[in-house]
Amino acid sequence: RFLQYMTDRNYNVILADEMGLGKTVQLLALLASRKKRGMAPALIVCPASLTDNWAREAAKFVPEFKVAAPHDGTERGAIWKSLPEYDLVILSYAAARLSGDKLKHYSFSFVVLDEAQHIKNPGSSNARHCKSLDAAHRIVLTGTPLENSAEDLWSIFDFLQPGMLGNLTAFRRYYADIRNDSALQHDLAARIAPFVKRRTKAMVTPDLPPKHERTIYCEMEPEQRRLYDAVLEEGRRALRSSRQDDARSNAAIFTTLLRLRQICCHPALLPDGEGKGVPSAKMELLLELLHEHFDSNHKVLLFSQFTSLLSLAIPELEESGIPFEYLDGGTRNRQQRVDHFNNDPSIPLFLLSLKAGGTGLNLTSADTVIIYDPWWNPAVELQAADRTHRIGQTRPVSSLKLVVKDSIEEKILELQSRKQEIFDSV
């Protein structure tokens, strides 16, 4: 009703329900009601990993729609000639960007951005191309409209209602201290509230089994700690010897942060064999946890930012005779792998890269999520956990985060906490 009410009054809005509450179905219901009024084609722009899911959901809930979900340039070229014949066109962000010259010749009834954090950087090509699309109505679907800073919201509203939050320079200046100023947080919340609909699982599905979150700490092995301290000291020396405004200095900082995170995960991730043979306390902890959960008949989703880390785990799993599924950004038959895991009780484990597997997948056959390495953005981790804690889940869900003591990972947790405070207040 929110979408119907607001679009009838020509307001562009954000549907920001928590993950797993049916944003896709709500949007399709709106489009179905508009089809009766003879609307022009609607355009869905989403991550490439979700285009097939959108097509499946459309076939299920609006089978009367003529839907185009082209996978490559040849297929896209074929639909431009007959675009007005379609009710719904589904493009990835990359495809929409590459098709800019064609899309500018069409006016859509709706342009819908799914997982709209893809336009949170106002200077990105994704943002520029999406904002150039012509449509009678614009809608954003995202459970995480604010991930890193208030500027995420500015960019989304620059797509929805250009000028509503002023220009970017003025916005930055006015909300410069929003992290520490509750009055500014409340001010921004009041400005955007009429255009945002957000429901939580507790509001919509009180019978949904609970999700229990737990952080499990481990200490580095002595040899691992020595390597960590050596890389940290090397980074400090490089920083002291460089100029503050030197681009190479910034690059060195990011490289050091990456190396420290890699050592926490597994020293073998370091380049040039620097950590070869150095044990990983966290990998040992992971294997213990997996065996405990498998012995209790739990199905587990294991997420890591590093696909190379997942690759390191595979030999250990194969040696133990543990069957598993695997998915990262390069996986083509995503849905087949998801269905295989969900439908086969003999497969207790799914290895997923955090970015590729964290959105758009329904994995309610699992009841345990393990975040192997904490990420700077807490919203990304929450999305990963919600692959299983969603409508259709019948068991309590455990979400475990593995953290190395006295390391950069504890600093990441502190940053996550500050970001979450801003999100909750706004």
PLM segments and residue spans:
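ASCE P-loop NTPase motor core, strongest for the SF2 helicase catalytic module
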Residues: 1-183, 189-426
